[in-house]
Every structure is written in structure tokens, then in C-alpha cells.
A protein has these predicted regions:
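Catalytic/RNA-binding core of pseudouridine synthases
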Residues: 1-158
């Protein structure tokens, strides 16, 4: 099942969890970038590739969740998994933050994709936000807002 995400990648800082929940483990200067450079890097991820799951993930190895091992500072070897990036688009770039959308196969770790994007841009990076907008035929755009439900309830006397 295909999934679509909107993500924000902060360049120049790498956290141990690849997201804002972690601690910064590395800082690097961010090279001068423009949208052409970023678009070329994003396009390089299109198609089939392999990705190593992050230590801070729910994936199990020998019956143990990786995040559980990571919290004990135990790092184990992880097998690369095949992923497919169907579409990836730059939405915005300012203040060393890349906003992008990605349509990908199940099992794709967007945090790892963000780290890999930063590496191809000759720096480090971690996600600062991630929002899944679509899964299969379900889209957040088709969802009903809670305020709409509350108004329906009030107007119907519930």
C-alpha cells in the first residue's frame, strides 16, 4: 500500500533518533543550496532502492524492538530493505529547512530518507516534522474535521 507524507528536514543538525525527539549528535555547516540543487537530489531518490531501518524504530530483530535496544545504547546490524519512492517534491526551502512531500511504498522510513537527502547535499539533517497525508485510497483531505462533527451534533440536538 502506498503512503504519502509531508516532511520538514532541518539541515545542519543530526539527532540520534533522526527527529526532534532525539539529542543532537552532530552539527555540520550547510553548503550554499538552491532549489535546483535540492530538486536534483530529491529526484535521485525516485524508483527502487534499499534502506537500512533506523535503530529508533519498531522493527523487530530476534524478537526485540530496535528502539528498545537503542535506548540501551545497543546497536545491531540491520538488513537493508527494498523501498520504492514513486514521487518526491520540494514544497519549500528556507532557513536551511527543506519541506517536501513523498509518495512511497510501505516500510519506507522517512526519517532515514531525510538523513540520506542531507548526506547527498553534503551535510547532516534530521526531520523536524512528519505528517502522513494518504494511505492507499484514504486521504486526510477527505477526512471530516472534528469541528464539523460537533456542529452536526449540536444542530441535530445530540
Amino acid at each position: 500500500e502506498k503512503k504519502v507524507y509531508n516532511a520538514e528536514l532541518k539541515l545542519g543538525e543530526l539527532t540520534n533518533t533522526l527527529d526532534p525527539e532525539g539529542v543532537i549528535i552532530e552539527k555540520q555547516k550547510v553548503p550554499k543550496l538552491d532549489t535546483n540543487i535540492i530538486n536534483n537530489v530529491l529526484d535521485s531518490f525516485l524508483g527502487e532502492t534499499f534502506q537500512i531501518p533506523p535503530m529508533f524504530s519498531a522493527k523487530k530483530i530476534k524478537g526485540q524492538r530496535l528502539y528498545s535496544l537503542a535506548r540501551q545504547n545497543i546497536e545491531v546490524e540491520r538488513e537493508p530493505i527494498k523501498i520504492i519512492i514513486d514521487d518526491i517534491n520540494l514544497m519549500d526551502f528556507r532557513n536551511n529547512i527543506i519541506s517536501f512531500s513523498v509518495k512511497c511504498s510501505k516500510g519506507t522510513y522517512i526519517r532515514v530518507l531525510g538523513k540520506d537527502i542531507a548526506e547527498k547535499l553534503n551535510t547532516v539533517g534530521s526531520l523536524i516534522s512528519l505528517k502522513r497525508t494518504d494511505v492507499g485510497s484514504f486521504s486526510i483531505n477527505d477526512s471530516i474535521k472534528i469541528e464539523s462533527l460537533e456542529n452536526e451534533w449540536k444542530s441535530s440536538g445530540i
